[in-house]
A protein has these predicted regions:
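Structural preference for beta-strand elements that scaffold enzyme active sites
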Residues: 5-7, 30-32, 60-64, 89, ...
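Acidic, glycine-rich flexible loop/linker segments
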Residues: 70-169, 434, 440-500, 525-528, ...
Length: 584
């Protein structure tokens, strides 16, 4: 089960017949809608298509609205594209002109007031570098420092300069309101500079009674410098390496990425690593070796999610890119499974819910639980568990579909819909049964269950229970699990403590339950449906006999002759080393 989540950007490539369905079916956790491009009508068409597919396939794929943000872009060239040459002059102007090789209009009217001669301007994610020569009220005359082609509406970055433009434009307001009204799950807020930028969006969402969660995209120096206050304000953060790698010295980028991921752990917030992760797959069917390492290293660092941009939005191999990223993640996680994050000495006082989540993760590790099951109204308990990166999968049982989708972004969480429970016993039974029905738990396995008491009160996570799944009577080690024909059997229990009891009571087809076996007992073992033995060891007489005679066998079933009632109908499951009582 892949624990690192994957975000895929939708676009022209995913509009092709069947592509979006393939993305949903092959593990896309979050669908990104890039509102820097396209109209509301265009995005709504894709959103409606996504909703229909996720409903049909039963996949809780979240929808993420990525805002345009306070960005600056070129307007349009007469020919759509121009080639700039090193040494020539090129003018950025706030006047409305037809773009040529010498001049082009920009979208931000006050840029001439924010820059100075000698400063640097980058075009198209830094592919073309300009040095400012002179500035007047409308024009910024620059020297081109390297050759390159430039197209319509490419980005303009001004590294190290605080822009006086307001954070939220009218366009962004309209887009955010659209997202709130349509039922999007996340807002990815572009170019967040301070915590106040996040609060401004939160206040707007509150006006529309929206529970959309906010992902703060870190794309400039101000965002990096204010990362702690931004993490405190936002619901998640994204290392948006495209613009960030232009706004800062690119040699700083790897260290900043690692630091932001590390800081996100301290705040218990999901962290997304994005931009150019499999960029070559826009045109090629396979990634470069460097891209494979890039994805893997982000996972080694502990990122919650990884993102595909142009690879799925406009690439030639969108489904292949997703499958490739998923395969890299799964393989990397096999070697990185022990990344449990302990509480550190300088953590300070934490909440009861946080302490309970940490204790649940430790308990699951100590008892080798198959899963951690949590019941949460808001999803916050599941996110706290995710913060500690336990080895066990986190099965989050929630009551609201939007909460289920929003948990799709968090590392290691599998969210399931569950009706409201009315008591603690009902909560435990319903949640573990739901996990079992969906194949995440099996009879005889241990689950660590955490929830809040009293039931139904949000924010009161304070209970941990170690729960044995099913009507389990005994557990041990299954023998012959590699042979699919002998992994399970059912029958009436014949509980015997001596060979004389076996001779007196046993009938063919029974499940023989004994302290140990011997050569004198082999004829009875041969006629038994299954064998349950208290003596441990895969080299024990019972283990060898059971394997040789192709009998479902569980050894090391401590207390089996005491816990299993003679004549009871039982099921022996070698795959999980358990003996279950069958319902009458």
């Amino acid at each position: 089960m892949r624990k690192t989540k994957i975000i895929c950007t939708l676009g022209p490539s995913t509009d092709q017949e069947g592509v979006l369905r393939e993305l949903v079916a092959n593990g896309m956790n979050v669908a990104r809608f890039n509102f820097s491009h396209g109209s509301h009508e265009e995005h709504l068409g894709r959103f409606e298509k996504l909703k229909a597919i996720r409903e049909e396939l039963g996949k809780p794929v979240a929808a993420l609205l990525d805002t345009k943000g306070p960005e600056i872009r070129l307007k349009e060239f007469k020919n759509g594209v121009e080639t700039l040459e090193a040494g020539q002059t090129f003018t950025l102007t706030t006047r409305e002109v037809e773009g040529t090789k010498e001049i082009c209009s920009i979208t931000y009217k006050d840029l001439p007031q924010d820059v100075q001669p000698g400063g640097t301007i980058m075009l198209d994610d830094g592919l073309i570098k300009l040095q400012i020569i002179t500035v007047n009220d409308t024009d910024i005359v620059c020297k081109v420092l390297n050759n390159g082609k430039i197209k319509n509406k490419k980005g303009v970055n001004v590294p190290g300069v605080h822009l006086s433009m307001p954070y939220m434009s009218q366009r962004d307001r309209d887009d955010i309101i659209f997202g709130a009204q349509q039922g999007f799950d996340f807002i990815a807020a572009s170019f967040v500079r301070t915590a106040q930028d996040v609060y401004d969006i939160r206040n707007l969402l509150n006006e529309y009674d929206s529970d959309i969660r906010i992902i703060a995209k870190i794309e400039n120096r101000e965002g990096v410098n204010n990362i702690d206050s931004i993490l405190a304000a936002a619901d998640a953060v994204m290392v948006a390496r495209g613009d960030l790698g232009v706004e800062i010295d690119f040699t700083e980028l790897p260290g900043i990425q690692k630091n932001i991921i590390e800081r996100s752990f301290s705040f218990g917030k999901p962290i997304v690593t994005a931009t150019q992760m499999l960029d070559s797959m826009i045109v090629n069917p396979r990634p470069t070796r460097a891209e494979i390492s890039d994805v893997a290293n982000a996972i080694y660092d502990g990122t919650s999610a990884i993102m595909l941009s142009g690879e799925t939005a406009a690439g030639a191999y969108p489904v292949e890119a997703l499958k490739t990223m998923s395969a890299i993640a799964e393989r990397t996680e096999q070697e990185n499974h022990a990344r449990f994050v302990p509480l550190t000495e300088n953590t300070g006082k934490i909440s009861v819910s946080d302490a309970t989540a940490h204790a649940a993760c430790l308990t699951a590790k100590d008892v080798n639980a198959a899963a951690i099951v949590t019941v949460s109204e808001s999803g916050n308990t599941a996110r706290l568990l995710s913060k500690y990166r336990p080895e066990q999968p986190i099965i989050a049982c929630v009551m609201k579909e939007q909460v289920q989708r929003q948990l799709a972004l968090s590392w290691g969480i599998t969210p399931l819909m569950m009706p409201l429970a009315h008591s603690t016993d009902e909560l435990i039974e319903m949640s573990t049964s739901l996990a079992k029905e969906n194949g995440y738990l099996h009879n005889g396995e241990l689950a660590v269950v955490t929830a809040g008491v009293p039931v139904g009160v949000s924010g009161t996570t304070n209970m941990i229970k170690i729960h044995m799944v099913g009507n389990c009577l005994a557990t041990g080690v299954g023998v012959g699990r590699e042979n699919a024909d002998v992994t399970s059997a059912t029958g009436k229990a014949c509980v015997c403590r001596t060979l004389e009891e076996v001779r007196a009571k046993f009938k063919p087809g029974m499940v023989l339950v004994v302290p140990s076996t011997s050569n004198e007992m082999l004829s009875y073992v041969r006629d038994a449906a299954a064998l349950v033995v208290e003596e441990p060891g895969l080299n024990s007489h019972a283990a060898i006999a059971g394997k040789a005679l192709l009998k479902p066998t569980v050894v090391g079933a401590a207390g089996a002759t005491s816990h299993i009632r003679d004549g009871l109908m039982v099921a022996v499951d070698c795959a999980h080393g358990s003996v279950q009582r069958l319902q009458a």
